[in-house]
């Protein structure tokens, strides 16, 4: 499954390595299509997530639990 999502990071979530965790924990491939983010400030990423459908859903839930709006 491949899906495009916009991730909105509040300022307190910009220092977390959540995209790395998506790769390691959920076996997802991430293609960053657009990024507007600065350390210590809010920002957004347009990404394409590719992986097994249950893992994509779990990965999105993980992001939301860590303060990222999907």
Question: How should these model regions be labeled?
Answer:
Residues 1-70:
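Long, contiguous binding/interaction regions
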């Amino acid at each position: 499954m491949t899906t495009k999502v916009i991730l909105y990071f509040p300022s307190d979530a910009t220092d977390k390595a959540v995209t790395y965790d998506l790769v390691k924990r959920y076996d997802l491939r991430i293609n960053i299509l657009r990024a507007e983010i600065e350390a210590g400030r809010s920002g957004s990423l347009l990404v394409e997530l590719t992986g097994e459908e249950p893992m994509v859903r779990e990965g999105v839930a993980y992001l939301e639990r860590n303060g990222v709006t999907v």
